[in-house]
Amino acid sequence: MNIVKALIPFVLCGAFAMAAKPPAPHLVVLKDNERLVANTLPTEQQIQDVIRLRGWRGERVSAQVVAWSAVLLCKWGGRLSCSALQAENTETVLQPQCLPVHETMAHGKPVADIVGSPCWRRDVFPGRNMPMAFMVQLDIPADAAPGVYRGTLRLGAAYASGKSYRGVTPSVEVPIELVVEQGVLPPPAEWKFHLDLWQHPQSVARWHKVKPWSPEHFDAMRPYMTMLAQAGQKVITCTLLDEAWNGQTHDDFPSNIEWIKGADGTWRYDFSAFDAWVSFMMNDIGITEQISCYTMVPWHMKVRYLDEATGKYEYIKLDVNSPVWEQTWGPFLTAFRAHLLQKGWLHKTCIALDERPDHMTRAAMAMVHKYAPELRIVSAVNKPTSLTREVYDLSPIITHADTVPEDLLTERKAQGKKTTIYVCLHPQKPNTFTFSPPAEAEWLGLFVAANGLDGFLRWAYNSWNENPLQCTDFGKWPSGDCFLVYPGARSSIRFERLRDGIEDAEKIRILRERAVALGTPEARAAIDKLNAELRAIFTVARSKGNSHGEDVARARELISETTENLFRL
């Protein structure tokens, strides 16, 4: 078989005796819900012998492998090469890529989570029996022919004695089997799953040492936001005022809008940063559905503004029961509405609230209704209340998702409203922390689909600590709570698995739509079976257990079975 050189160089350390013949290195496949524990060899219970992948056309599939050497090697490294995958009776050739998975620290323990570029690190085999993980990943082309594709992952490792090159170890191979199914997943921009991961532009500016909102800043942000768009992101995160969350992140979270009080007491607003950010996300990145603006009810209940009379920054103390409330928000909303109308963004923009009590939420809604009625309300809440019916985009925490009854979900869908779930530092599981079992992230998307919800919200896509490449801890949060991707536009195991869950949800949606379009008893029976089993598995009660890996495996089986049944009708 022609081996395509998708090669990753390894640099290996140590030396053999001159006459020693080195043994072959080791290459194994991690099971789906396993992580490599740094400096620890995987156990028999964690591994399998074959990379088995299955997916629709247009879907991303992946597996983790682990490589190590039982002897200390040095100088030029080994090569991990993946052959092209080919199927019988087709000329289609599919080429996976191999990406190293590097460790970072989480609560004092090394965790392999960072999906890096091949040239990022050089100490692949830093010592005897010190393993390194890789992700074998493939975006199946939308026009690929369905069928079974096979190929090989091969690892060899060079060795040296002193300064002399002495030869290579025997190579070791792992078979790859990919089943490409009949279904076709559309591009992420066309997915219906309502993904809302909050962006943090200032983190990118600080890491890359560029001036906020400069051309260099937007250049630096482009790969991160492109990666987010490729996961199906629908929402642009904006800020109406400084530190809406009262400074809970390592980097500042300033307002996208400058508030200015003139010497004559009138208000004006500088929307230049807001305009640049939204235009970039829409026009350059392609995230166009919703603009969520935080917030009218900040955690600190104050608004920072520039007082032209003194040349100093001052603060307004907000109180929903005080005349200051309307005196502050009336002029702003009037100006904001006019500006959004001019830009063509009025009907995409929402006023966003984060875990605010009902009386504050109602006060914000009253101001919006009076001064900018076209704006809609987004609200992340711990537990739904009587306001549930009124909020356009509602996101309860997953542990209270079952308090939104099915008839209310149906009503909200009919009105074009969104109902999503979120996780944050709670619950402990399922979640997307650095140390979370990988299947938990995928489980979240399946929970959304199984329960007729619209999507998923999480408070931080990239609110990095000082150096997440070294450690993902920050403050009082569980490690990794503040971000899902890493500097250098590096993905993570947890982000990739979250994306897998979104793809699962999209496949379920498409299967449901296909069953309705077919309209046959066989199609109805197939989709009813899928829905019933998913609803039985993906419950709030079950979310608190330890079965996320087996739940995801069963859901994948069900999706494949239903795909086969519906696409042969």
Say what each PLM segment does.
Residues 2-9:
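Sec-dependent signal peptide recognition
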Residues 12-23:
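Bacterial Sec-dependent signal peptides at the C-terminal "C-region" and cleavage site
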Residues 21-47, 60, 67-136:
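Surface-exposed binding patches on compact interaction domains or structured appendages
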Residues 53-59:
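Short, solvent-exposed loop/linker segments at the N-terminal edge
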Residues 70-72, 139-146:
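Short, surface-exposed loop/turn segments at beta-strand-coil junctions that are enriched for proline
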Residues 102, 107, 111, 139, ...:
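Aromatic-lined carbohydrate-binding surfaces of glycoside hydrolases
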Residues 302-305, 313, 317-383, 453, ...:
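Catalytic domains of carbohydrate-active enzymes that cleave complex glycans
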Residues 393-476:
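Catalytic-core region of carbohydrate-active enzymes that cleave or remodel glycosidic bonds
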